[in-house]
């Protein structure tokens, strides 16, 4: 049965450092025999929706492929591992998604899943009804 690794970094405003830390975790997962590594929602940047009044965070959105996905494609290809990431995608001017690209072990983008919006920061930690 294939091994699945779950990976999470302590993301900061330093996007290149975030990518490097993620790639190190991917290399470690591959070395331990994982065939697939999965990152959480908004796994490569601080969870910025809590600062929704600050428009500068839209500058962090990137296309697929873009800087983060291209970096992940290289490490996937080098280590023969499948990666499911999650980034803030800019699909077109004014069109943004919380997107999960799937990168194959050969480095190709196999597909992506897009959410229509990022969770509202004020309700994402609300008490449940039970």
For the regions a language model picked out, list residue spans one by one.
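Active-site catalytic loop in hydrolytic enzyme cores
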Residues: 64, 74, 90-130
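Feature marks short, surface-exposed loop/turn motifs that line or immediately flank catalytic pockets
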Residues: 10-13, 43-46, 91, 117-119
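Active-site-proximal beta-strand elements of phosphoester/diester hydrolases
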Residues: 1-13, 38, 99, 112
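A short acidic, glycine-rich active-site loop
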Residues: 57-70
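Glycine-rich anion/phosphate-binding loops
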Residues: 16-21, 65-66
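Active-site beta-strand/loop signature of hydrolases that rely on acidic residues for catalysis
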Residues: 4-7, 18, 26-56, 76, ...
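A structural motif corresponding to the C-terminal end of an alpha-helix
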Residues: 68-83, 87
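Short, well-ordered beta-to-alpha junction loops that form the rim of enzyme active sites
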Residues: 41-42, 86-89, 113
